[in-house]
């Protein structure tokens, strides 16, 4: 069972929670899912931003989030039928990287065309094909924050929007549940989908 939630924070909530960067938001989301017997992270989230008055964060999880001290949260179960469609519109914020075969180091993917090609090439491993003409790449940039006084983290970011066709249901479900790409604990990898009826 998967649960979809929306956390809404107003300006006063963000100030009280001291959300100043991506790590501040990471800390708030993690507080909604206390550790249970050392089990690994079982949730994903995506910061949808908002207007001057309200910020919205989408959350996908295997358990219900705690009631937050600040803000409002709305949760509902995702019906199994929702994940049995063949075609979806999608949006996903990804930390796009590639691993060097020799050094095993990861390097960021740069440039809109390279990002476009990278996503299409990776899609089959995630269980779907992308309609190439539908794929848009936006919000290309870098997210940086101080995790503590001595550690600064930097992640490349890009948002991909388009249409997909499921070609391997098990892989698709696994990547919907666990997210795609790296840095999923920092708001990357949540595949936001809407079914599309094909005639």
Where are the regions that the model predicts?
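RNA-interacting cores
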Residues: 1-199
């Amino acid at each position: 069972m998967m649960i979809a939630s929306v956390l809404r924070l107003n300006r006063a909530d963000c100030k009280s929670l001291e959300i100043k960067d991506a790590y501040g938001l990471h800390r708030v989301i993690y507080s909604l899912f206390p550790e249970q017997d050392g089990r690994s992270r079982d949730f994903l989230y995506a910061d949808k931003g908002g207007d001057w008055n309200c910020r919205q964060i989408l959350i996908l999880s295997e358990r219900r989030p705690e009631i937050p001290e600040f803000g409002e949260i709305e949760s509902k179960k995702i019906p199994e039928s929702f994940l049995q469609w063949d075609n979806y519109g999608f949006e996903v914020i990804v930390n796009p990287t590639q691993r060097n075969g020799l050094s095993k180091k990861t390097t960021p993917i740069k440039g809109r065309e390279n990002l476009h090609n990278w996503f299409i090439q990776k899609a089959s491993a995630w269980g779907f094909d992308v309609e190439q003409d539908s794929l848009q790449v936006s919000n290309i940039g870098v997210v940086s924050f101080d995790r503590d006084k001595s550690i600064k983290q930097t992640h490349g970011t890009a948002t991909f929007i388009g249409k997909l066709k499921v070609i391997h249901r098990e892989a698709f479900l696994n990547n919907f549940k666990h997210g795609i790409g790296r840095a999923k604990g920092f708001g990357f990898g949540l595949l936001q989908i809407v079914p599309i009826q094909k005639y």
